[in-house]
């Protein structure tokens, strides 16, 4: 496990995952095929960064957010 920080476009940390197990990037097409309900709920078509911790998957549009690991 490792720590991951989700950063907004200003570089501010909006979420920290202390028990992150995986980070991946899904293209907009992959998101539409695999997780259309997430795009509907968030309301934003974009490539997404997906973090996985003990609570499950967390989705953040890459147009707005970035991720840093440590």
Residue ranges of predicted features:
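Short, flexible beta-strand-to-coil junctions
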Residues: 1, 6-11, 45, 52-56
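Short secondary-structure boundary micro-motifs
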Residues: 8, 32-36
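N-terminal acidic leader/helix
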Residues: 2-28
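Short, mixed-charge low-complexity intrinsically disordered segments
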Residues: 35-70
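Short, surface-exposed linear segments at secondary-structure transitions and domain or protein termini
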Residues: 22-33, 66-70
